């Protein structure tokens, strides 16, 4: 289900997932022996329409990265449940969910500039007011801009599977990041992951189940959840299903 994209070093899993550019160090409060990345290096040109959206819409919807707590009410102009999305790619899924759930605030972290421009363009065209973007690595954003118990949900959709065994350690869903995310969730808040790589799906269940603060929202023996209605089926996912490929959703909630 991985479409080829000759202009990039890594191939997105679907039309919404494009992970992006520069390494950061693990936050001080997370023990980890190596650098944590929430993205992979990508290339790609920003179209004129995307650049126009960055220039004209960006000042309204882009929140500058700063290593101090985010003022959610100031950023969104209201108090509302807060959802973080890590790596929104070209933004179609993010825009769809934000329109479907206008009562929630959606903060997307993405460093890939064409993706940022694409989501800004969608938000402007569809008059979506409950999206904000931080164009910075998500690990640093979570560690330094998000306080404990501030999130109602986290979305991680189709992260790079790093399917070769020797590359598995590069996967995004790892215990240090999950521990950090759990600390930022409110009691009852959720982490929702989706992948089309079965082995990674099982690893997601294992890693999330290994975090004491979380519990599986599913009672299924395999630990997987049904796809929530708010997550749309992308065109590549639909094509993969026709070819007999699977997609797995994993949802865990914070205890308490």
From Swiss-Prot:
UniProt xrefs under SUPFAM superfamilies: S-adenosyl-L-methionine-dependent methyltransferases
PROSITE patterns in alphabetical order: SAM_MT_TRMB
EC number: 2.1.1.33
Compositional bias ranges of the Polar residues kind: 1-11
Recorded GO CC terms: tRNA methyltransferase complex
Catalytic site: 160
GO molecular-function term, one example from the UniProt record: tRNA (guanine(46)-N7)-methyltransferase activity
UniProt-listed InterPro entries: SAM-dependent_MTases_sf, tRNA_(Gua-N-7)_MeTrfase_Trmb, tRNA_methyltr_TrmB_bact
UniProt-annotated stretches for the region Disordered: 1-35
Alphabetically ordered keywords of this record: Methyltransferase, S-adenosyl-L-methionine, Transferase, tRNA processing
Enzyme category, top tier: transferase
UniProt keyword annotation of tRNA processing present: yes
Binding, S-adenosyl-L-methionine: 85, 110, 137, 160
Residue span of region Interaction with RNA: 166-171
Pathway(s): tRNA modification; N(7)-methylguanine-tRNA biosynthesis
Residues given in the record as substrate binding sites: 164, 196, 234-237
Described purpose of this protein according to its UniProt entry: Catalyzes the formation of N(7)-methylguanine at position 46 (m7G46) in tRNA.
Family: Belongs to the class I-like SAM-binding methyltransferase superfamily. TrmB family.
Name by which UniProt lists this protein: tRNA (guanine-N(7)-)-methyltransferase
Taxonomic lineage of the native organism: Bacteria, Pseudomonadati, Pseudomonadota, Betaproteobacteria, Burkholderiales
Gene of this entry: trmB
């Amino acid at each position: 289900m991985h479409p080829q994209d000759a202009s990039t070093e890594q191939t997105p899993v679907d039309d919404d997932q494009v992970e992006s550019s520069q390494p950061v160090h693990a936050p001080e409060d997370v023990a980890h022996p190596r650098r944590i990345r929430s993205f992979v290096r990508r290339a790609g040109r920003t179209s004129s329409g995307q650049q126009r959206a960055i220039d004209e819409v960006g000042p309204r919807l882009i929140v500058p990265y700063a290593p101090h707590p985010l003022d959610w009410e100031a950023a969104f102009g209201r108090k509302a449940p807060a959802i973080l999305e890590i790596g929104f790619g070209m933004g179609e899924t993010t825009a769809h969910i934000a329109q479907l759930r206008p009562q929630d605030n959606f903060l997307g972290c993405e460093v890939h500039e064409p993706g940022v421009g694409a989501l800004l363009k969608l938000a402007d065209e569809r008059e979506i007011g409950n999206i904000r973007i931080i164009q910075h690595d998500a690990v640093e954003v979570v560690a330094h801009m998000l306080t404990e118990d501030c999130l109602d949900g986290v979305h991680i959709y189709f992260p790079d599977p790093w399917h070769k065994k020797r590359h598995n350690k590069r996967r995004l869903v790892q215990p240090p990041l999950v521990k950090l995310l759990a600390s930022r969730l409110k009691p009852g808040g959720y982490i929702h992951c989706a992948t089309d790589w079965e082995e990674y799906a099982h690893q997601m269940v294992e890693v999330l189940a290994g975090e004491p603060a979380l519990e599986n929202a599913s009672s299924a023996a395999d630990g997987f959840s049904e796809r929530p209605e708010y997550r749309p089926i992308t065109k590549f996912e639909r094509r993969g299903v026709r070819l007999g490929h699977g997609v797995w959703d994993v949802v865990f909630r914070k205890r308490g």
